[in-house]
């Protein structure tokens, strides 16, 4: 904070205390902290009127470019790391013994509630891409403390195709291509066929692109497979699974890479349906360990898909 004595030390408390008695308590806490930090930021950098107006215009531009299927504010929060930070605050689990489950990361905007259930061993590839490398993905779900298999968990997987586009972005893909839900068996096992993921760039035609360019940062996202795992007794796990040889791991534009989510894809020679093999085991924590055990999983900004609307966005 600036120590410049020109600034009235009573101004910020005056603004915070202007909230009336009917303000909900949580809103009072959140808005009060927000006002204090924004005021401290302005004092610290001694924000000029021109810079303030530039910020106002930038915020306006976020709203102007957003549509029902393009949430630019969501993307801005991603590129400044806010969504990843909120996810860490909301979902980080560490027991008193220092035990943690498989890491949680951001959901991203392109999860769909409409993915169909498939049988173990099925493929989520409905529209083959000639550049796609078919992968046999398999693993076991276990309790992080006991190691017991977790039976009947729902594993919801989705990914972009080999062209870097999700199903509803690409008119050549059918609905729910590269999406599916599976249930773990009596041994906690799961398996299916998918693609080795493909890296892609965030859209750079809007405010997020302007901001990334200003900060001299790459818009690239490393290749990843999305996975959300739910069970009535366990805290939800949301993953993005990354190939260890992806060149963008250290410069992920949304700061979602975590060490235990980086995996090795290995050649597969004993299965005519797959070129690669991915073993990915997951540990889950009982809900009692979650900081907010009754919280619902996050909902995608684009939960309501409109198949008639095709865009060129990527995230």
UniProtKB/Swiss-Prot annotation:
| GO MF term list | catechol 1,2-dioxygenase activity; ferric iron binding; protocatechuate 3,4-dioxygenase activity
What is one GO biological process annotated to this record?
Answer: catechol-containing compound metabolic process
Q: What happens when the gene is disrupted?
A: Abolishes growth on benzoic acid, benzaldehyde, benzyl alcohol, p-anisic acid, p-anisyl alcohol, m-hydroxybenzoic acid and p-hydroxybenzoic acid; and reduces growth on p-coumaric acid, cinnamic acid, protocatechuic acid, p-coumaric acid, and caffeic acid.
Annotated Fe cation binding lies at 166, 200, 224, 226
Catalysed transformations (reactions):
3,4-dihydroxybenzoate + O2 = 3-carboxy-cis,cis-muconate + 2 H(+)
Q: Which cofactor(s) are needed, names only? A: Fe(3+)
Name of the featured protein: Intradiol ring-cleavage dioxygenase prcA
Q: Give the species this sequence originates from.
A: Aspergillus niger (strain ATCC MYA-4892 / CBS 513.88 / FGSC A1513)
